[in-house]
């Protein structure tokens, strides 16, 4: 039975994409039995985490550094350090870094298996749907 897990983000290997990377510090792979997922997301300048949604989890985003824009429907909103964003399951969104420095934010999900679906599965930087954790 799992009692607790301590993870050092400095020791976590990033999952790399064309747009940046994610360091998953807690999920059911890191801590078997964990029912949530928690990661540190890095979006490179000029790059976009493409349009996607999560069928099985709520998402909380907390921006640590940099600035990015997030799109819901046809409207863009600015995220800056210190802002927190709540995204219900099933809401399509994409994040774009229009700045000159990387954007770093914490992403917390209410489920370890998020059920992520991309609008364009052939978009650059998208992992295949067979991937179990994204």
What are these model-derived regions, one by one?
Residues 24, 39-54:
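Conserved short histidine dyad/triad with adjacent acidic residue
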Residues 67-69, 76, 92, 102:
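Structural motif
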Residues 74-89:
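Short acidic-glycine-tyrosine-enriched beta hairpin
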Residues 40-41, 86, 101-116:
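A short hydrophobic beta-strand segment most commonly corresponding to one strand
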């Amino acid at each position: 039975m799992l009692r607790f897990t301590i993870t050092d983000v400095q020791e976590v290997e990033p999952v790399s994409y064309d747009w940046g990377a994610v360091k998953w510090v807690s999920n059911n792979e890191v801590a078997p039995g964990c029912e949530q997922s928690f990661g540190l997301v890095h979006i490179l300048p000029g790059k976009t985490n493409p349009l996607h949604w999560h069928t099985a989890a709520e998402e909380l985003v907390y921006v640590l550094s940099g600035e990015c824009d997030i799109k819901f429907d046809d409207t863009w909103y600015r995220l800056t350090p210190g802002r927190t964003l709540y995204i219900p399951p099933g809401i399509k969104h994409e994040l774009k870094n229009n700045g000159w420095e990387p954007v770093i934010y914490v992403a917390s999900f209410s489920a370890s298996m998020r059920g992520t679906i991309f609008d364009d599965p052939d978009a650059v930087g998208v992992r295949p749907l067979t991937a179990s954790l994204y």
